UniProtKB/Swiss-Prot annotation:
Protein name: Trigger factor
Designated gene of the protein: tig
Family to which this protein belongs: Belongs to the FKBP-type PPIase family. Tig subfamily.
Function description: Involved in protein export. Acts as a chaperone by maintaining the newly synthesized protein in an open conformation. Functions as a peptidyl-prolyl cis-trans isomerase.
Chief location: cytoplasm
Enzyme class: isomerase
Organism: Legionella pneumophila (strain Corby)
Domain PPIase FKBP-type: 161-246
Catalysis: reaction(s): [protein]-peptidylproline (omega=180) = [protein]-peptidylproline (omega=0)
MF-aspect GO terms: peptidyl-prolyl cis-trans isomerase activity; protein folding chaperone; ribosome binding
GO cellular component, one term: cytoplasm
A Pfam family it matches: Trigger_N
Annotated HAMAP family: Trigger_factor_Tig
Amino acid sequence: MQVSVETLEGLERKVTVSVPTEKVEEEVSSRLRNLARKVKIDGFRPGKVPFNVVKSRFSDSVREEVAREMVQSTLYEALQKNELVPAGYPHVEPLEIEPGKDFKYTAVFEVMPVFEIVELNQAPVELIQSEVTDKDVDNMIEKLREQNKEWHEVTHAVKKGDKVVIDFQGFLDDKPFQGGSAEGYELVIGSGSMIPGFEDGIVGGKIDKPFDIKVSFPEDYGHKDLAGKEATFKITIKKIMEGKLPALDEAFAEKFNIKEGGIESLKKDIRENMARELERRVNMMNREKLFDSLMSVNHVELPIALIDKEIEHLKHDMYHRLFGHEHKDDEKIPDFPRELFEEQAKRRVHLGLLFAEYVKKHEIVADNDKVNAMIDKFASAYESPDELRAWYQSSKEHMAEVEALVMEDMVADKIAEDAKLKYKNMDYDSVMNPKKGTEKKGELACQAIQIILSVMQAD
């Protein structure tokens, strides 16, 4: 067997394999003889079919079978000998075997990048630290009161804080636009859930007295056809409701399963939950900062095949989040634009390659004590912690998920050892509800929803 390897563009390689005709013919003849012993053909007794008849009828199909199997065996051998690790499925051609000629084929594929990890070497990395304050707890209590308002209908003009039920229709240049209308839509004025100016334009409105408002979509709005454009909305208020905040008493505390201790017990419970979530978020953000720092000093060429595969995973994840179930074979997945997922896919592939190499270099293995400690930590947030522990321990897949999280923490800790750390204090709200750096994620989600709605309406 002869093998040649040609470097194409980037990580792409072209492997040419040539198998001697003698080996091919020997394998084809062997299979035809074996077939002759058991094949049934009208006019001949089983096992008595002349070889030439078998060869005439089955030679082409047997050669195709031999070609497929030879590609599998010889390509694997060629990759092993040349230390090539494909990043995706090879594109192989041709697969035909011509009688009397060497079997020659080519395989084109991307290889996994070969690189050495560059350490941070005391490069500065800014991490964050935060804690839950009394003010944070009080703010959370007020949010819970807002969420538990008792609403009653009123007849006065709309004011900020009221809840309205509206019908509306949006127009661009006097023409209705897709996704710009709704009936019986509930909206709390001042919630900021609509585009700027929309909610303010409803203030002062009255029941069953239609009016128009003009608003402009933000320049960075997710739907490109609407971004930066001025729209007119025709609005009719069907109902106005005023909210009354519940009193801070034992009855309020009981709504959150507080049996004893009233509001003070509720505050304690809220503080513990907030602290747990804050710790989780801070750890996640710091881990991401450490990973980003490692990525910034390790520029790796990324295989397109891996990026494409990750994009497909992200598409299915998006489908699951929006429709609440996994994609089924008979269901149509909307044709999401590639750019919706490309940046995130590239980051995942980059980080995955670095992670694997870093673990190998530093011989990092998931510590059993840390795995069990993480399971205990998860379990502590549940009413029946033993059941959750049993669930994780019931399958290798569940345990593997925890082991992967532990490995991430161990890698992050190792990166931190090699960095010059400094800390920035952030308040609870800034950590849990970041205002900057999330616009793009929100825009992507908005685009996805708009696309899906368009597809569903088109169908």
